[in-house]
Amino acid sequence: MREEIWTEKIFKDDAGYFLRITKPKSRIPLNMRKTVAVLGDASADPDSFKYKLAFETGKMLVDRGYRVQSGGMGGIMEAVCAGAHASKSYREGDTIGILPSFDRTKANEYVDILIPTGLDIIRNGMTGCADAVIAIGGGAGTLMEMAAA
């Protein structure tokens, strides 16, 4: 059986012309959860306001049915993943870490899906894979990631 990949609507407009609107059907399941990338200061201290804000952001996002994506390392990246794990709605796979190196040991303990790219700062463009982006603090690197998104 062939999968239908196009939907069509044919109708008459006010002038009597037949119009055909054709568009591809989405191949993304309707139940697929959206991903939000959270960017920020890699050296944020666990006692800082930014770290606590990132923790609460990760928790809130997972509570509302989103996955979180980060650089997978320390600071804000760790906080958002830890917050996601603290959510009552947390499921395995809710945290995605896109590492700039191939060294898996650099990832924080809260990353479920680890993607070691080996792309260094070029991996910043991977934020474009997310459905939305949130920045919490940071500097030039965070700004570069935001611009790439």
Sequence positions of predicted segments:
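Glycine-rich beta-alpha loop segments
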Residues: 21-88, 92-93
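Acidic/glycine-enriched connector segments
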Residues: 55, 62, 74-148
